[in-house]
């Protein structure tokens, strides 16, 4: 052992993402113009009706919608447990956009699940199939969706490698917190891979102008990482056809919720259907 790492917190408040205190405060409020565009779409979107949408880097998404540029959603899940209330909020939003000619990518975070020592490969592959059935039942057109395991989509890994060149240690510490980086450093690999997921719809193999993540606000840390690393790496990303810095579109959960509600933590989660006992 050659070094002992010490750090000093210079500002108060939880970082965005997995250690957020009040998840409903993450991101920026959506503008009136976005609500007008969504109101002109076919069908109804609850967070648009009650004007509760929040965003990260929302202007490129707004401009792409106004100019009718090609758009793809990146929205998936970690297969760590049963379908829950947060999933249905997100899946209904994906279904709404699909019905209005926005296509969807659905990354399955098997890389992150594989790092979870509580889950065997057999268990998380079971939850992949179980969750996909529920997403389909919630209205997502799986036949029209690019569903993939992170570990099998080489283009995601290529993009993650490109953006990782712009990574500095202070960035994930600021986003995810020093405690997370000290106690669970391999998580950073999963975080950078998710950046590749969010950028993937713009890859030259698919040729889309803009991509955006649809999620709960607990994923804001990944969106911050995506925006910052994409900005730092845009010139290199252009070699892969990437044109814009991705956006994030957040569906608020229950107001005032403390911590991260997740299928990884059954005691904090509102399940729909069979729940964690299969």
Question: How should each PLM-predicted stretch be described?
Answer:
Residues 123-149:
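A glycine-rich helix N-cap at a beta->alpha junction
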Residues 77, 107-112, 145-157:
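Short, glycine/charge-rich beta-strand/loop segments that flank catalytic centers
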Residues 1-78, 227-278:
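Non-catalytic terminal extensions that flank enzyme cores
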Residues 58-62, 91-102, 127-132, 186-202:
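Structured alpha-helical segments in the cores of large, soluble enzyme domains
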Residues 85-89, 119-127:
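Alpha-helix N-cap and loop-to-helix initiation/capping positions
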Residues 107-122, 251-254:
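Short connector loops at secondary-structure junctions
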């Amino acid at each position: 052992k050659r070094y002992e790492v010490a750090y000093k917190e210079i500002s108060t408040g939880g970082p965005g993402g997995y250690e957020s205190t009040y998840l409903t405060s993450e991101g920026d409020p959506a503008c009136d113009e976005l609500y007008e565009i969504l109101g002109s779409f076919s069908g109804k979107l609850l967070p648009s009706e009650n004007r509760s949408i929040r965003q990260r880097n929302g202007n490129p998404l707004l401009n792409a919608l106004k100019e009718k540029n090609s758009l793809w959603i990146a929205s998936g899940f970690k297969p760590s447990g049963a379908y829950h209330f947060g999933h249905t909020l997100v899946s209904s939003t994906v279904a709404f956009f699909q019905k209005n000619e926005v296509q969807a990518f659905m990354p399955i975070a098997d890389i992150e699940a594989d790092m979870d020592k509580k889950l065997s490969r057999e268990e998380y592959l079971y939850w992949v199939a179980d969750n996909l059935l529920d997403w389909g039942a919630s209205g997502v057109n799986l036949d029209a969706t690019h569903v993939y395991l992170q570990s099998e989509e080489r283009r995601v890994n290529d993009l993650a490698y490109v953006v990782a060149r712009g990574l500095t240690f202070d960035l994930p510490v600021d986003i995810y917190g020093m405690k997370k980086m000290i106690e669970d450093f391999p998580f950073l690999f999963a975080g950078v891979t998710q950046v590749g997921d969010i950028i993937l719809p713009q890859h030259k193999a698919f040729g889309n102008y803009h991509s955006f993540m649809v999620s709960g606000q607990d994923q804001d840390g990944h969106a911050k990482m995506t925006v910052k690393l994409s900005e730092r790496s845009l010139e290199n990303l252009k070699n892969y056809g990437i044109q814009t810095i991705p956006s994030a579109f957040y569906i608020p959960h229950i107001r005032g919720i403390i911590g991260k509600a997740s299928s990884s933590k059954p005691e904090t989660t509102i399940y729909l259907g069979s729940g964690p006992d299969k």
